[in-house]
A protein has these predicted regions:
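Histidine-dependent nucleotide/RNA phosphoesterase domain, centered on the 2H-phosphoesterase fold
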Residues: 1-186
Length: 186
C-alpha cells in the first residue's frame, strides 16, 4: 500500500489555501484544462513518502513514528510565499518557514526509517504544500507570470501537535487518504 508520513495543516490554513487557489484561478481561463488543483482539505505537509509498503511493515513504521514524536515538543511553522518547481511551472506550491525543529524532525524520521530498510531521501527537504500540478505548457507559462503577485501571501501558521501515517489510494477522481496512525508530540 502507498504510504506516507505527514503533518496535518489544520482547518484555518486549509481554508486560506482554498482562498488562494480561487484567487489564482481568477487569473486563468475558467475552461482551462491541463491543471489539477489539490483539494485543500487533503493538503498536508509530507515529511516522508515511503511509496508501496507491505502491510506487515506498517507496525514497524508506526513504531518509528511514535518513538520520533515523543522526542519532539509541539511547535508552529508559518505557511507563506507562493512558488513553483519547474520551468515553466509544473508544480505550484506555498512554502513552509522551515525551522530547525522541523528539519530535525524530518531528518530523524528519515534516518530511522533508512536504518529500518527504507530508501533515504536523496533530495534536501523542501517543506511545501502543493497547490496544483500543471500538465499543460501554456498554463505553466501563464502561471509563471501570475505567481510573483502572490509571493507575499501568508496562509497562517500550522500548529504541529502530531505526526500522522497515511495510506494513499489513487483513484480516477484523485487521491484518497486513510489515516493509519497519529502520534502526539511531547
Amino acid at each position: 500500500m502507498r504510504t506516507f508520513i505527514a503533518i496535518d495543516i489544520g482547518e484555518t490554513v486549509a481554508a486560506n489555501i482554498g482562498g488562494l487557489q480561487n484567487e489564482i484561478r481568477g487569473f486563468l481561463d475558467p475552461k482551462q484544462e491541463g491543471i489539477k488543483w489539490v483539494d485543500p482539505e487533503l493538503t498536508h505537509l509530507t515529511l516522508k513518502f515511503l511509496g508501496d509498503v507491505e502491510e506487515d511493515q506498517i507496525a514497524g513504521i508506526t513504531e518509528i513514528v511514535a518513538r520520533t514524536a515523543e522526542n519532539f515538543k509541539k511547535f508552529s511553522i508559518e505557511v507563506k510565499k507562493v512558488s513553483s518547481f519547474g520551468r515553466p511551472p509544473r508544480v505550484v506550491w506555498i512554502g513552509i518557514n522551515v525551522s530547525d525543529i522541523l528539519c530535525r524532525l524530518q531528518s530523524r524520521l528519515d534516518s530511522r526509517l533508512t536504518k529500518a530498510g527504507f530508501e533515504a531521501d536523496e533530495k534536501k527537504f523542501v517543506g511545501h504544500l502543493t497547490l496544483c500540478r500543471v500538465k499543460d505548457f501554456a498554463v505553466g507559462k501563464q502561471l509563471k507570470r501570475i505567481i510573483p503577485g502572490f509571493e507575499g501571501f501568508s496562509a497562517g501558521k500550522i500548529h504541529v501537535k502530531s505526526i500522522c501515517v497515511y495510506k494513499s489510494e489513487l483513484t480516477k477522481t484523485g487521491p484518497e487518504y486513510t489515516l493509519l496512525a497519529s502520534y502526539n508530540l511531547a
